[in-house]
UniProtKB/Swiss-Prot annotation:
Gene3D superfamilies referenced in this protein's UniProt entry, alphabetically: Nucleic acid-binding proteins
UniProt keyword Phosphoprotein, yes or no: no
Top-level lineage group: Bacteria
All copies of domain CSD, residue ranges: 1-45
GO CC annotation terms, alphabetical: cytoplasm
Induction and repression of expression: In response to low temperature.
Record-given protein name: Major cold shock protein
Length: 45
């Protein structure tokens, strides 16, 4: 809905995620509880 949210790492840290970073075909969306693989990168704030 908002185009951004947070992903929780295995150790419980929350990481900001913007929809533009989602690499998939079709509609870029994630569901609560969905398992994903990701790399943490520093970006502009």
């Amino acid at each position: 809905e908002k185009g951004f949210g947070f992903i929780s790492t295995e150790n419980g840290q929350d990481v900001f995620a913007h929809f533009s970073a989602i690499q998939t075909n079709g509609f870029k969306t994630l569901e609560e509880g969905q398992k994903v693989e990701f790399d943490v990168e520093e970006g502009q704030r």
